[in-house]
Amino acid sequence: MNRAERRAEFVYEAARLENTAAHRPINPEPWGQRDPAFRRNMIQAVARQCGRNRLTSPAALHADWVRAYRTMGWRYGSSRNVQAKTHPDMVPLSRLGRKEQEKDWVFFMLCEIAKRIT
């Protein structure tokens, strides 16, 4: 596993733990159970956030996440369904509830921590 992969898995799994602790309604599958396209996208997103071209706000990160999910064939749905590729968070960040908005802040800060992973 290279540094980019280690960083992405760290951010993803730490975010999952925080989701559980915060009792958020959606907590996705463990890293190893996600499909390869998702893992590639996450590796790229975390690598960007750990580099010079990082996005500077959780709102920008969320918009980027929505674009990436659309590219992978996902669409808005009232519930998260992996088989149907629907997700209720595929809306602008401002339309999400506080708990769901906090996920983007958590991801943003976890990427700052991940920069230290060598």
Predicted regions and their residues:
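Alpha-helical propensity feature that highlights long, continuous alpha-helices across diverse contexts
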Residues: 1-118
